[in-house]
């Protein structure tokens, strides 16, 4: 037996489809939205629709942006000869919070995972290799320390090493299986400073 009406159930069901939102959180969000003033709900809806319509990949690093180039790639003060490779935009954001990394990024949008059917062709690896045809001194591989992240790091290392470009891997300190977005800035900074050559 349903406790709530069809519209409430539909809203809860849709919200629970979001990553990290379970049934109870979806219910709390649904009731919060229902109790919001109409103008606020309309503003939230417009903001989500505008974001979906206008956010795309940066043509250089493939992070999410609303312009052709993200603010980092468009910044000439950044070191464009050093590229940090991360799995997701949220990992890039975690390193930016340290305020110490001055290079640019490349977002793969995942990691190699044969168990999930994700191979190199499903990631932005080909685009990374094309970027390396420019004047690049170092590629820092900052994938997660999970099995998939390590597999991706080794694959990239073997692919890039023959080009003569220095390839480094962030140091440990990031727990095995840990997601970078949840690691504090100090640990990320030590991992970056202690990176090792592959």
Kindly label every feature range from the protein language model.
Residues 8-17, 27, 33-36, 76, ...:
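S-adenosyl-L-methionine-dependent methyltransferase catalytic core, i.e., the SAM/SAH-binding region
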Residues 2-8, 17, 27-92:
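Cys/His-rich Zn2+-binding cysteine-cluster or related metal-binding knuckle/ribbon modules and their
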Residues 41, 117-118, 149:
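Alpha-helix N-cap/helix-start motif
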Residues 129-198:
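Long C-terminal interaction/binding lobes of large macromolecular proteins
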Residues 16, 34, 49, 62, ...:
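Signal for well-folded cores of large energy- and translation-related assemblies
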Residues 28, 43, 56, 68, ...:
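Residue-level signal for pocket-adjacent positions within structured domains
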Residues 26, 75-140:
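Extended interfacial segments that mediate partner engagement and assembly in macromolecular machines
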